[in-house]
Amino acid sequence: MARPMGKLPSNTRKCAQCAMAEALLEIAGQTINQKDLGRSGRMTRTDNDTWDLASSVGATATMIATARALASRAENPLINDPFAEPLVRAVGIDLFTRLASGELRLEDIGDHATGGRWMIDNIAIRTKFYDDFFGDATTAGIRQVVILAAGLDTRAYRLPWPPGTVVYEIDQPAVIKFKTRALANLNAEPNAERHAVAVDLRNDWPTALKNAGFDPARPTAFSAEGLLSYLPPQGQDRLLDAITALSAPDSRLATQSPLVLDLAEEDEKKMRMKSAAEAWRERGFDLDLTELIYFDQRNDVADYLAGSGWQVTTSTGKELFAAQGLPPFEDDHITRFADRRYISAVLK
């Protein structure tokens, strides 16, 4: 049985920045409107909650963009997202604007420097994994791309897509509208034919996608970056089933498998997230991720896809770090989180 959620132990309080790192890994860009917050400031997930990019959970997409801005400015960066910082500024959340611009350092939020370095490296690794996935897919001849829960993803604008590539971005209407307008204000032009599909993934998004021009007879590269932890177990299965139903042979899918935690690990993770929430609250940003993530036991993503006819390849975060020559980390919590599997699959 998990211990009660009481006062945070001192070692947990000291690692607020590690908690921020963990929190960033869980965020997929999904957001829920401020109007759904109760008087306590906590979020209660409902079947019809909505989201934008400027309030409450909407800020999670901005948090990931902030991390990409930091990773892009790192010494010898693995990624380059020139739109990350200006998009963060456009959203206007003070904490993230100051972090993205360099005015505020991660060390100013928490006192665990290793956690901050790992967070930046991890977001770089994660971003590069999906960038490389799309590069490999187009090299194999795929010219139809679907980015699920796109948030502030700018791959349609920053990746060198081959001629004839069509990119479909799916997210909430407010998210799609904001990003499209903000990038237009930056005079940014997509490098592929971009179609923004404004639909909730809990609704009939396959029909909306096809109505936008998607051709299920063509091989497609799908991405579900950081998304699955924000879906209940049955929602995860429905999403994967829908992707399979839309996929022609040789289609590809990239995603991440949520960590399987025992009760003690789950309780510890929640406490660390609350520690991060306390640190953020001191900076004027109020968000408790424990109210957003589904910790329920669920089907193993790799096994589920394999059972649906996909040929699955997995890599752990540790393996991706090693492949880039990045140093390992000794913090137990970070090491555990680096066990998360990155999944690339091809439908046969």
Curated annotation (Swiss-Prot):
EC identifiers of the protein: 2.1.1.-
InterPro entries referenced in this protein's UniProt entry, alphabetically: Ppm1/Ppm2/Tcmp, SAM-dependent_MTases_sf, SAM_mthyl_Trfase_ML2640-like
S-adenosyl-L-methionine listed as a keyword: yes
GO BP: any one term: methylation
Binding site for S-adenosyl-L-methionine: D171, D200, L201
Record's keyword terms, sorted: Methyltransferase, S-adenosyl-L-methionine, Transferase
One Pfam family of this chain: LCM
Classification via SUPFAM superfamilies: S-adenosyl-L-methionine-dependent methyltransferases (SSF53335)
Gene Ontology molecular function, alphabetical: methyltransferase activity
Chain's role: Exhibits S-adenosyl-L-methionine-dependent methyltransferase activity.
Protein family: Belongs to the UPF0677 family.
Protein's recorded name: Putative S-adenosyl-L-methionine-dependent methyltransferase Mb3432
Species assigned in the record: Mycobacterium bovis (strain ATCC BAA-935 / AF2122/97)
